[in-house]
Amino acid sequence: MDSQEYIPQYKLILVGDGGVGKTTFVKRHLTGEFEKKYIPTLGVEVHPLKFQTNFGKTQFNVWDTAGQEKFGGLRDGYYIKSDCAIIMFDVSSRITYKNVPNWYRDITRVCETIPMVLVGNKVDVKDRQVKSRQIQFHRKRNLQYYDLSARSNYNFEKPFLWLARRLSNQPNLVFVGEHAKAPEFQIDLNIVREAEKELEQAAAVAIDEEDIEN
């Protein structure tokens, strides 16, 4: 019976400076807002995001900080028993990228070597402060990276898909059907192409140890 179907569930911690778009990102999912649960002792909201795949359903229980990061760091209880993580920064704010190593350090201190994705949100903005060629932290730490625009759904599913493949050990896993709400607007394709071109070029050159993160 369908009610007895086994659905793999993963705890996903979503971290990054306040205002980078973490909650907006989660709420783009069709079920992201309606089924959330609040954990007052940790000050977090847990959003169960379900995805249909060619191997059946899978679910990420996304822990969103609910603004707690503004009060200086997160409690270890937020990180404990996490299966994977997304670190988010805002490409229109250089300081949010400079703080990425701090978030990475906090995760690895508690969780060690869980799969992680670094995402640069708000790539739809015209005044991009963190250029694609400057984003190198993921290369130094062997993380996956994606440009993202939560409001336009650009690359919305890619972080989840990459993590689902890693966690299930199914490299051929794909998502089936729609999982995101209709986009708020259409992203400028010229901006997308230029950023993708820069990322490709950056990946082909040696890592610059003097880039803008520490």
Swiss-Prot record:
Residues 36-44 are annotated as: Switch-I. InterPro entries: P-loop_NTPase (IPR027417), Ran_GTPase (IPR002041), Small_GTP-bd (IPR005225), Small_GTPase (IPR001806). The keyword Nucleotide-binding applies. GO terms for biological process: protein import into nucleus; ribosomal subunit export from nucleus. GTP binds at residues 17-24, 67, 121-124, 149-151. Keywords: GTP-binding, Nucleotide-binding, Nucleus, Protein transport, Transport. It comes from the Eukaryota. Coiled coil: none annotated. Found in a nuclear export complex with RanGTP, exportin and pre-miRNA. Belongs to the small GTPase superfamily. Ran family. GTP-binding protein involved in nucleocytoplasmic transport. Required for the import of protein into the nucleus and also for RNA export. Involved in chromatin condensation and control of cell cycle. This is GTP-binding nuclear protein Ran. It comes from Plasmodium falciparum.
